Amino acid sequence: MSVAQKLYEKGYITYMRTDSTSLSKEAMDDCKNYIKKEYGNKFYKERQYSNKSKNAQEAHEAIRPTNMKLHSIDKEYDQNRLYDLIWKRTLASQMSDAQLERTNVKIENSNNDKIFTANGEMINFDGFLKVYLEGNDNEDEEKAGMLPNLKIGEHLGYNFINATQRFTSPPYRFTEASLVKQLEELGIGRPSTYAPTISTVQRRGYVEKGQNEGLERIYEQIILTKGSLNTQTLTE
């Protein structure tokens, strides 16, 4: 919150102690003009959001940049990161849906009754993801997630087959971010009280902040490659 306070005091973002999700007409028009100019008309989709929380107070609009044309700021690391997050989220909120193509293939084994699966996914239209993917060289990742054109009954060979043993995971421990989200969902506190509340319960010893995410568990992964089985023992 202190980083957001600095951005607000310097005039980079609007008032930050709010849980509103709505944007002003002026802000929505600024987003529309930027999106159409930089990405094209098909990337724009006007959206207006409302807060589902019963205790929400929407005297202010959502946290957003004061100038959408200002893509980045030349400040210290934490301020740059937070501004970038706010800028991208604001712009993405007024953009079209992304369109993904997902392929799931079931493969029968001629030697036994085992069924194997292969999954692939690719982006047909970036939509709002354009803001987050911009500047990332993800061509290799997209190719890795694609499947070739296949026909029913087609005979296939294999490079390798993975068999992984997994366990049902218990609920994760709270992080500061997930705890704030839970407080918001339960209607406890306000944006201006979340940070002080979390600091207070730590200072009084009610909770302890640590790096321990739980006990590591061992699992096995069996890989079949060119008729040879290899077993790896991994942890999660």
Residue ranges of each PLM-predicted region?
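Extended, highly charged linker/hinge segments and catalytic-adjacent loops that couple domains
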Residues: K10-D84, A118, D126-A163, G214-E236
